[in-house]
């Protein structure tokens, strides 16, 4: 049996010399993967329970190992556990401590198991929990948006294309577009849970094991749906990491787009919203400044999340199938993206909770830029049997006239309109009211007030 002396790595009986200081520095991952300690302990407990059930170890050994593992968990939770970089990672640190607590019988914990399947089991369990936590945080920000939307159904603002006034919309409808984005993000993360539901434990290094183990038992104990099918693929698989990183990248992109929009709306040129003092900073030289630094932070961090996805893709693209040390970086990459994304969701949630719409400025801007021109074209089609392209040309002529006269469309009188289209009556003037314009878009998914109320209720129920 291997003598697990304190100055020896677990595999020290094969490698006769200590690793160089440089190798120890770059090769150990304990500072990163120690957050897997609970998953590692749970996995080991399930494993030894299975070994006992299959008559591979005795009842006494099983209980001693579980006692030692529970003691280690308490030490870590109370910050009394001493991590040693010599033992590379959390898995070997825990095993080394287990030897110190219960002696040589700790060696049975690794029966029918390799670090390869141990690591990926821990990692999948951690990623499952992280995925569910992100979905909770997305639920929270959706609830925030729904609350703001309920208060602003009849708050009118311009909708933009190319950052130019396009058509009038409800501020609530604009906000509800964010709900759709985050709901898709939730669906993506939820879909990822399926690939995380297969249990790697028991495939050992890459070929499985000659021991009569029960992988269905450990799957059930650890919350997996089923064991993986192929031992080689199991050890090599990091698709679930890519799935997480891709989902995080798309969600970060949504957050960045929203942040960019809020920055623009908060700018002096637009002044559509006011940000709370809680989420802005000042200038070191300009006393009047209130800068949207947190929103700018969200934009910037999106690049890091993107970079992590491409880092992982690049690591994997050159690897033959099975395990290689290159894969050690997978956890640092995923942990970082997870941290950034959760922070970003929390920051945006805080910004939105304290955001104040400048309703009069929104309305004033909605009344500029000939924003009801499309409504006029639609009116001509519906009321004068005019082909849309002809209605488009007629409306363009009216806009050109208003522009020449330096008037808004709602400032034109009926006589001026009849000069261009004689069939128009005074009824057409209602078309130029932006509130009427917004409320007329009754097609499913449109910006009418009833549509918005129904969509808010739909999401509140789910």
Curated annotation (Swiss-Prot):
Family stated for the protein in its record: Belongs to the lyase 1 family. Argininosuccinate lyase subfamily.
Protein name per the record: Argininosuccinate lyase
Subcellular location: Cytoplasm
E.C. number(s) listed in UniProt: 4.3.2.1
Name of the gene this protein is made from: argH
InterPro entries per UniProt: Arg_succ_lyase_C, Argininosuccinate_lyase, Fumarase/histidase_N, Fumarate_lyase_CS, Fumarate_lyase_fam, Fumarate_lyase_N, L-Aspartase-like
Record's keyword annotation contains ATP-binding: no
HAMAP family hit by this protein: Arg_succ_lyase
Catalytic activity: 2-(N(omega)-L-arginino)succinate = fumarate + L-arginine
GO molecular function, one term: argininosuccinate lyase activity
Chief place where the protein resides: cytoplasm
Pathways per UniProt: Amino-acid biosynthesis; L-arginine biosynthesis; L-arginine from L-ornithine and carbamoyl phosphate: step 3/3
Annotated TM spans: none
PANTHER family xref list: ARGININOSUCCINATE LYASE
NCBIfam families (UniProt xref): argH (TIGR00838)
